[in-house]
A protein has these predicted regions:
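Catalytic Zn2+-binding segment of zinc metalloproteases
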Residues: 13-27, 47
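Generic detector of well-ordered alpha-helical packing
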Residues: 11-12, 39
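Post-HExxH zinc-binding segment in Zn-dependent metallohydrolases
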Residues: 21, 31-59, 67-68, 73, ...
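C-terminal, non-catalytic "cap/extension" segments appended to globular domains
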Residues: 8-9, 16, 43, 54, ...
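Short, solvent-exposed segments of well-ordered alpha helices
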Residues: 3, 28-35, 68-71, 75, ...
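Short, glycine/acidic-rich hinge or "gate" loops at secondary-structure transitions
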Residues: 24-30, 53-64, 163-170
Length: 221
């Protein structure tokens, strides 16, 4: 499935970063902070695009469109997960119904395209979807790291569209640093923008929007 391929290529990014820094001393410098680690993996998903046809055959174009669109819509979703956690941790006495109501309200803000009125899917329409996000239970406040990393991964995606070889040089410049620097310094040393800069998110979204709008949907259902 699409998810299987995304997981394999995602984890390959983590493995590649680990292998690249396997001889680093001290060993605590092999890995950077969590959001920086996720750049390795989420970016590798896009670097693997040239091999997508080996997995999807005639459905390759469908996968490319879905993958990029999903990467974009993940950012508001991931931000919503973080916002939800702030709410429930600040108000630990909330009832289950109040938590569900908070999630439903946030869905309307961050993902207004989601249909919250389908009576056939009460688990979702009642605002209980957050219970499926295991990070909320197992790794509190980790999810925003994925959003930061996804923004950088989209930087790499935009670079790849222009020059794959040059994009890979930037990826290697980022990866070989291991955990020797802070997240923002890793980016700076690799010639990348920081996702904390508004221009970064605006830039990658504009590039992705143009690509998606010009995508030939012929034969795709």
């Amino acid at each position: 499935t699409q998810h299987d391929v995304e997981v394999v290529t995602h984890e390959a990014g983590h493995a590649f970063a680990s292998w690249t820094n396997r001889k680093r001393i001290p060993t605590s410098y092999v890995w950077p902070s969590l959001e920086a680690c996720e750049v390795h993996s989420m970016s590798m998903e896009f670097f693997a695009w040239p091999w997508a046809e080996g997995f999807f055959g005639p459905d390759t174009r469908k996968f490319l469109y879905s993958h990029l669109a999903g990467a974009l819509t993940f950012i508001p979703y991931g931000t919503m997960v973080d916002h939800f956690q702030h709410i429930v941790y600040e108000k630990p006495d909330m009832t289950p119904a109040e938590r569900n109501a908070a999630w439903k309200e946030l869905t309307g803000i961050y993902m207004p395209w989601v249909n919250m009125n389908d009576s056939d899917l009460p688990f979702y329409t009642e605002g209980r979807r957050w219970q499926r996000q295991h990070h909320i239970y197992s790794s509190p406040f980790y999810y925003i790291d994925y959003c930061l990393a996804q923004t950088v991964a989209l930087e790499f995606w935009a670079m790849i569209q222009k020059d794959l070889g040059d994009a890979w040089k930037h990826y290697m410049a980022y990866t070989v640093q291991g955990g020797s620097r802070t997240f923002t310094d890793l980016l700076k040393n690799a010639g990348l923008e920081s996702p904390f800069d508004e221009s970064c998110l605006r830039g990658v979204c504009a590039a992705a929007e143009q690509w998606l709008d010009s995508f030939d949907m012929t034969g795709i259902r």
